Amino acid sequence: MKLIENIFAIALVAFIAYMGIDFNAKEDVPVKPKTPTFSQFMTCEIGENWSNRFVMVDEWNDMKVSGMSGSLGHRVYAGDDGANDGTVSWQLFWDSKQKADAFWNNGPTDEFKAWADRHRSVLVCDGEGIRNYDVDLPRPENKQGEWNGDGEFVSVVYQCNFTTTAEDGTVSPMEDKEEGKRQMRALYGEFMDYVDQEDKNASWHIWSKTGKRGPYNFGVYTHNGENPDPFMDYDFYWMNYYETDEEAKARLARWVETGADLQAKFDEFSTCEETLIYTGSSVLFPDLDD
């Protein structure tokens, strides 16, 4: 995806900051966020004035972006060659692809330009490397648990392909990717039932210090069109969201212990890399404009 260079200089430099944002700062948002169906990722390099990121994000919070459901910043710290390499993966959530296209096609507003000009040295984003995904976020908000509100959390990324397994155990790529998506979505309900039951039973787990588990959510990302290499090496990315690293490891260990039957059902249509990618992630909600 290639846009006019000066638009990237103004706009893409602008999606900034790997940091914690206070959710309570946006209590007066007049429009309830919609569940996003489309998401974009950009790989960005930390600039020389990274220390100014808090000022930049504070100003970002005062702008309106039509159709944007929210933003995340991810910085890999384990499980990938790019860990701690001075880059941030910036993620945008949109109500729809149409809203995202309208934003990019219309170009930045004067307010947006002025803001970007003030802060362009904080982060530099590779506009030509933008990646487009359809996103499923099936778990209801009222089932996720209580996030602590500081905007910081842990993402654990599975890199996966849709596959078939022959009777002799040979694993092959699935030709019909849409069938793979159908089978995956058909398991969301059973997976969420498993998570709910685990949360219900958490009070007697020896590792549970509070008598309950921390919050949990997940998102599944499939390509919308062609994305740059090497991202097309995988058919989908499954991302688990936890409040802390400790919580992530405890839940993953519990999955190994109790989730074998459900894992076998996922294995019928998919294969994921054994190495998981851990990222420290942060939330940023812009003003919402219907």
What feature does the model see in each segment?
Residues 1-12:
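N-terminal Sec-pathway targeting helices
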Residues 16-290:
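Short S/T/G/P-rich N-terminal loop/turn motif that feeds into the first structured element of a domain
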